[in-house]
Amino acid sequence: QAEESCLQNLASRYLQTVTDYGKDLVEKALAPELQAQAKAYFEKTQEQLTPLVKKIGNDLLNFFSHFIELKTQPAT
């Protein structure tokens, strides 16, 4: 009985060790892939947003310069 319990305990610890090792291995294998996907996503987002942000900035400058021109014109 005691020997059987010892073998079950040993088998249980072995299975837990193998399971933990497998989880660590999967995490290590997926980490670079996920990092690459995240980097590609952020680069694509930046590539798409940069022209939009520049256009918005240009439009705002034009908008405010229009009001400045109205203030500087003499009243008729």
From Swiss-Prot:
GO cellular component term of the entry, any: spherical high-density lipoprotein particle
Location of the protein in the cell: Secreted
UniProt note on tissues of expression: Plasma.
Keyword DNA damage: no
InterPro entries in the record: ApoA-II (IPR006801), ApoA-II_sf (IPR036172)
Modification Pyrrolidone carboxylic acid, positions: 1
GO biological process, one term: positive regulation of phagocytosis
Chief site of localization: secreted
Protein keywords: Disulfide bond, HDL, Lipid transport, Pyrrolidone carboxylic acid, Secreted, Transport
MF GO annotations: high-density lipoprotein particle binding; lipid binding
Gene3D superfamilies: 6.10.250.100
Protein role: May stabilize HDL (high density lipoprotein) structure by its association with lipids, and affect the HDL metabolism.
PANTHER family xrefs: APOLIPOPROTEIN A-II
Subunit structure, interactors included: Homodimer; disulfide-linked. Interacts with NAXE and NDRG1.
Protein family per UniProt: Belongs to the apolipoprotein A2 family.
Protein name: Apolipoprotein A-II
Organism from which the protein derives: Equus caballus (Horse)
GN (gene name): APOA2
